[in-house]
């Protein structure tokens, strides 16, 4: 059955001031691609970063490095830092390239100031925080950045524990996908899966599923995006120890 659909029928959230509508296919398409391609991007990072330490074991260079004066500190920290920089910069480049490609295909970036809630039936239409497309793109890029850093931590830790790059890749891949299944169970356990890289990159679900509410973990009570930042920071600091 075909016909007109009203704003109320589309379930658009109401705010104190009118929503801004515009042609925003560039932004909506970019958001959809980024939402669905975070796993592909993570696999790329795992492949690139898996040999960071394990390659040294297989080549015998580890014994030489660890026997030097700064082998156990400077060299290892430098490798972790390089891995984080690769992940962080790659995340920004990936997001920007996707947006530029969509802008080139749809002939521009019109609608940057349109509210994301006007993108009917999209993952971002039910986010209870009012943002325009440009603001939300920056938020998506931030969550991609956090997810990339978390993925880098995982890859480096597995690489340090394994003597072969292939085993490190498989191990990091299994651990990366492990939180996928508890999320499907829903409930409190499922909600906490957002702190892991496989889910933290999906900004639409992080902001919508958490419904901008406080999540308790005694003695702290924070919103889920804040928890993602906290746990990513903790994982990063621990990896340097």
Over which residues does each language-model region extend?
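Short helix-to-coil transition segments within interhelical loops
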Residues: 66-72
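Transmembrane helix irregularities
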Residues: 68, 161-162
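A cytosolic-side transmembrane-helix exit/cap motif
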Residues: 187-195
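Membrane-helix interface/capping residues of multi-pass secondary transporters
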Residues: 72, 164-165
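Secretory targeting signals
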Residues: 4-56, 77-161, 172, 180-183, ...
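Junction motif at the cytosolic side of a transmembrane helix
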Residues: 157-161, 230-241
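Central hydrophobic cores of alpha-helical transmembrane segments
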Residues: 166-179, 195-198
């Amino acid at each position: 059955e075909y016909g007109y659909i009203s704003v109320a029928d589309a379930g658009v959230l109401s705010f104190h001031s009118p929503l801004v509508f515009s042609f925003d296919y560039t932004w909506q398409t970019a958001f959809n691609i980024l939402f669905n391609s975070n796993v592909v991007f993570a696999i790329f990072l795992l492949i690139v970063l898996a040999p960071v330490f394990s390659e040294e074991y297989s080549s015998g260079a580890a014994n030489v490095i660890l026997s030097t004066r700064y082998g156990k500190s400077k060299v290892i920290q430098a490798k972790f830092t390089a891995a984080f920089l690769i992940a962080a910069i790659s995340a920004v480049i990936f997001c920007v390239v996707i947006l530029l490609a969509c802008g080139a295909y749809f002939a521009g970036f019109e609608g940057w100031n349109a509210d994301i809630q006007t993108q009917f039936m999209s993952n971002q239409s039910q986010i209870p925080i009012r943002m325009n497309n440009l603001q939300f793109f920056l938020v998506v890029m931030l969550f991609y950045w956090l997810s990339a850093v978390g993925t880098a931590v995982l890859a480096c830790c597995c690489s340090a524990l394994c003597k072969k790059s292939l085993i490190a890749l498989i191990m990091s891949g299994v651990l990366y996908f492990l939180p996928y299944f508890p999320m499907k169970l829903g409930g409190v356990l499922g909600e906490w899966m957002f702190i892991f890289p496989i889910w933290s990159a999906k900004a639409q679900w992080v902001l919508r599923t958490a419904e901008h509410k406080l999540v308790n973990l005694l003695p702290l009570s924070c919103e889920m995006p804040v928890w993602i930042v906290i746990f990513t920071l903790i994982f990063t600091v621990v990896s340097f120890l």
